[in-house]
UniProtKB/Swiss-Prot annotation:
This is Ribosome maturation factor RimP. One of its GO terms (biological process) is ribosomal small subunit assembly. Signal peptide: none annotated. Required for maturation of 30S ribosomal subunits. CDD domains: YlxS_C. Gene3D superfamilies: RimP-like superfamily, N-terminal.
Length: 125
């Protein structure tokens, strides 16, 4: 079964691509998870502007209302993924080859969960 974040991703991702944006992450935050935060990035490598976030924030609620996914949410926040954007999809690792990254693992690897280094290769095994 998909999480609500995955369901929202499935519903809005194509619309964001049509608008020229990549959906980076959907997450709930705030007290009782009443705030839906959507992080976006530009598909054409330009910086995401405040106007871009406003445009997306006016489009997404209509899509979510039709699908009836976040009826209990009190607000929707759209923001640029920024300089410290999370690398969520495999394609992100190839896009950022050669860049310095901080990685946080869910499980211990060699007695650590945090690593820092440069992405030199990305393989999907």
């Amino acid at each position: 079964m998909q999480t609500i974040e995955q369901q929202i991703t499935n519903v809005i991702e194509e619309s964001l691509i049509d608008m020229g944006f990549e959906l980076v992450l959907v997450k709930f935050k705030g007290v009782n998870s009443k705030v839906v935060e959507i992080l976006i990035d530009s598909l054409n490598s330009e910086k995401v502007s405040v106007e871009d976030c406003t445009k997306v924030s006016r489009t997404i609620p209509a899509i979510l209302d039709v699908e009836n996914l976040i009826e209990d949410a009190s607000s929707l926040e759209v923001a640029s993924s920024g300089l410290e954007r999370p690398l969520v999809k495999f394609e992100n690792y190839n896009r950022f080859l050669g860049r310095e990254v901080k990685i946080t693992l869910k499980e211990l690897l060699n007695d650590k969960t945090s690593y820092q280094g440069k992405i030199i290769k990305a393989e999907n095994k």
